[in-house]
Design a protein with these regions (language model features):
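Acidic-glycine-rich active-site phosphate/pyrophosphate-binding loop
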Residues: 16-28, 61-73, 261-280, 312-330, ...
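Functionally critical mobile loop/hinge segments
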Residues: 19, 23-33, 41, 105-124, ...
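Membrane-embedded translocation segments of transport machinery
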Residues: 260-264, 277-310
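Hydrophobic alpha-helical bundle architecture
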Residues: 54-57, 83, 305-318, 322, ...
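Conserved phosphate/anionic-ligand binding catalytic regions in large, soluble enzymes, centered on
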Residues: 37-53, 283-299, 341-345
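Early transmembrane hairpin of solute transport permeases
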Residues: 45-148
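Signature of multi-pass transmembrane helix bundles
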Residues: 126-280
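Glycine/charged-rich beta-loop-alpha catalytic/anionic-binding loops adjacent to active sites
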Residues: 27-36, 73-82, 276-287, 327-337, ...
């Protein structure tokens, strides 16, 4: 029995969704909270940030460093190169970079301005100061606690739930901050302009229908600065990844093997941006859901398609609203770190944005999302490292295939694996 006989004709899903002014405000605030610049892989940077803050609280250079971290942090830091360290990898290297040369006020750009002399100091510090690393058994999925000591003094700083959310500070046993979800840096990242905006925007307002409607009707002046920065930063690192020798050079392999059709370029450039980033490229990216790789994946394929099809700047930015918000919507229930590969949700979201960019509405976007998730949903996260680039290429390919399936009248149905209806 074929699919059409079993399930009936290919169904349309179009329906009208009206967004309120408050919905528009919330969607824009979500983007402002999420689409922030980061320098290097966000987990090592979060560790460097936490360590820099601990040194600041201590008030002197530590002579002993104790790092406690959740399993997700450990797997995402152990194999990735920490930028501006001369190629160093690992948890102690990230912490040492923050302690020696970090500026905690710069948040996710905490080690963006490390000098060559400071790189030497980081290496010397690692050789001369004892570091210990322990797994946290009772914390959040994203959890870091750095304890620093010098003579009779000590300081403890804890970051939890989000990459720059400091929830605990103590010096010599005196608690200075305890279990707060907001801090100066988090407020800076959210670019809050009122006290009410200190609390993170309500992600439960997001829906696929609402996202598509928002992309059609949003006042771009409220978010264009974020999106234009994403285009500039993320396409820049993708170009560098293609032109230079980074990581496993997945992007170059794809282009050399399959040519430069738009689908191959979309996969290749996204992969190349990740390869560069995972291998210590000293360029910033605009992140999504706390991840630079996801930020690259939701944006670069859409940029490639916009260039290929000569789309206007406005059309590109509206498509990026789709990819960014769908990725955030998917990740909201999963969390910023998990055993699930975040490139999957980002690649699926990119496919949805391409469908929207090429004239699709909720029907095209929804079917693209279901089809693409059904293809790549089983990929696990085994840490941040160069092979992320290959996973990104596969996920972008699944996103595009999901859309092409829709265009050819094909779809996955309920009871097909993860698909429920």
């Amino acid at each position: 029995m074929n699919n059409s006989a079993r399930h009936g004709s290919y169904r349309k899903m179009e329906k009208i969704v009206m967004l309120t002014r408050e919905d528009h405000k919330t969607y824009a605030q979500i983007l402002r909270e999420e689409l922030t610049p980061a320098f290097g892989c966000t987990e090592p940077i979060a560790l460097a940030y936490c360590a820099a803050k601990a040194r600041e609280v201590l008030g002197q250079m530590p002579t002993e460093v104790i790092i406690e971290a959740s399993g997700n942090i450990i797997k995402n830091v152990k194999s990735v190169i920490v930028p501006n360290t001369g190629g160093m990898k690992g948890i102690p290297a990230a912490a040492a970079a923050g302690i020696v040369a970090g500026d905690s006020k710069a948040c996710l750009e905490v080690i963006a301005k490390v000098t060559p002399e400071e790189q030497k100091e980081i290496a010397e510090y690692l050789n001369n100061v004892p570091f210990s690393v322990k797994a946290m058994e009772d914390g959040d999925k994203l959890d870091i606690r750095v304890t620093v000591k010098a003579k009779e003094n000590s300081a403890v700083v804890r970051v939890s739930k989000h990459h720059t959310d400091i929830v605990y500070i103590a010096r010599n046993g005196e608690v200075m901050l305890n279990e707060q979800d907001d801090c100066e840096c988090a407020q800076k990242l959210a670019e809050s302009q009122a006290a009410a905006a200190e609390q993170r925007a309500d992600r439960s307002r997001l829906s696929i229908e609402g996202i598509v409607e928002y992309a059609k009707t949003a006042d771009l002046s409220t978010v264009s600065d974020l999106l234009n920065r994403q285009v500039e930063y993320n396409y820049n690192i993708a170009q560098v990844g293609v032109k230079e020798d980074w990581g496993a050079n997945v992007g170059s392999v794809l282009l050399d093997t399959y040519g430069e059709d738009v689908r191959t370029k979309a996969r290749a450039y996204a992969a190349a941006g990740s390869d560069a980033r995972m291998s210590g490229c000293e360029l910033p990216v605009v992140i999504n859901s706390g991840s630079g790789n996801q930020g690259i994946t939701v944006s670069v394929p859409v940029i490639i398609y916009a260039k290929e099809y000569h789309k206007s700047d406005e059309e590109l930015l509206r498509a990026l609203l789709v990819s960014n918000l769908i990725a955030i919507h998917i990740k909201t229930g999963i969390g910023p770190l998990s055993a699930f590969c975040g490139a999957v949700s980002a690649g699926c979201a990119a496919g949805c944005a391409i469908a929207f960019l090429l004239g699709g509405g909720i029907d095209e976007v929804a079917h693209t999302l279901v089809n693409s998730i059904a293809i790549t949903s089983g990929i696990i996260c085994d840490g941040a490292k160069p092979s992320c680039a290959a996973k990104i290429a596969s996920s972008v390919d699944a996103g595009i295939l999901g859309y092409e399936m829709y265009r050819h009248g094909q779809q996955f149905y309920g009871e097909d694996g993860i698909v429920s209806k």
